[in-house]
Amino acid sequence: MADKILGNEFTNNKKVKLIAGEVYDNMPYTKKAKSYMTQGELEGKKYGNTYSIYLTDPGEVHDGLEATPDTVTEYAVPVTLKNKNTSVELDAWNKLGDIESFTDEIARPRGRKLARSVEKEVIEDTIPKAFQIVVGSANFKTLTDMSKALDEVSMAGTKVTFVKPTVAGTIANGGLANFTPSEIQSKIYKDAYLGQYAGASVIEDNLMPVVNIAGTETASFAVASVSGNGDESATVVGYNVTGFTGSPNAPYKLEGVKVIGLDGMETDQDFYVIADKDGKIPEVRLAVKGHNVNNANGWVETGSFTPSATLAVESGKYALGQCRDEQAVGFDQYKFSDLPGSENATESVGNVSMKMSTYGDGKYMTTLTRLDLPFACTLPEPRRAVVGYFKI
């Protein structure tokens, strides 16, 4: 029998809390995302506007005893404020006076749909933000290569790998016993959690993209040289990528470019870019070997660098996966102002906050209950993620 809550005990806040819980449970990709903006920074921000978050460089290291202080260099990462909403007529909202009915008819279906809509957008916005890729079959080797690529750039966080359920199933058929269970991660990700492998928690998410590569995709990029200071004022010590054209979701190798690790050290890892749905790539800042300049994320051998990009995969169909620092993705929420004359409630579960507004429409003599999930998402540091192209 349903658990009845009499009188006004089943409040709007409790209803919103139930929905927020459903949303949180159905967003595995976003569950452990990090907040990069404080509520103070978000105060007064408006839907649709683009703002910046700022990250700093690892600084310089010098030989000897003499201290040589350097300036902290920041670089800006743009982030756009978005919103998803769903609404129901007030009668439907109010008529369900017990937890079980409200959960079955309102909280679960609407919470899940809202969650998956937000999750899809977060994935689409952040998956292309990576400077390393791994191409392979749905097997344990590809999972290992993705995880170890993060180790090569000194990524020190907790690693998680997201793949489509069909990819996870194919891999598991090759030896489910290879996955090591983790009670903590199982509680967080629930049924989406497959297990630990190669130092990463493997999570299923059916919204991970599938892309078709024709094999004829081309790309080009342009660079502007950066000169040094003082005695090196006439020397090219780095480059900024000033233009890029390429096909969305196709990975391109930047020839002659290697990744600079998160510790500021030059690595031997090849440098890739993936264009997003708008054809844009993350900011690429290059240093000439041996120079600490420009808060660089990649390096080239000499100051006579000629830019070129080549398609990094053959033609075919690929399911995309991602191995990343668990908190590499940024997920922030901002607040709407209350509508005049409306009743409002806001509740949070995990890193998800939901706002409910009930208001009347005098023109049509109706009353609606509206649920909003305002958010901003990004992956500000592409070196903290690796994208897997699983051939299917």
What residue spans do the PLM features occupy?
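N-terminal "assembly arms/tails" that initiate or stabilize quaternary assembly
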Residues: 1-76, 385, 389
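Short helix/loop capping segments that flank catalytic or ligand/cofactor-binding pockets
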Residues: 61-64, 170-173, 378-380
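Autoprocessing Asn-cyclization modules and mimics
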Residues: 169-295, 392
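Internal mixed-charge
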Residues: 108, 261, 275-385
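Short, low-complexity, charged/polar segments at coil/turn and helix-coil boundaries
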Residues: 36-46, 139-169
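Short, Lys/Arg-rich flexible segments
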Residues: 2-37, 89-101, 110, 115-134, ...
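Surface-exposed molecular-recognition determinants
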Residues: 7-15, 162-167, 354, 358-359, ...
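Long, contiguous amphipathic alpha-helices that act as assembly "spine/axial" helices in icosahedral shell
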Residues: 53, 77-138, 151-165, 254, ...
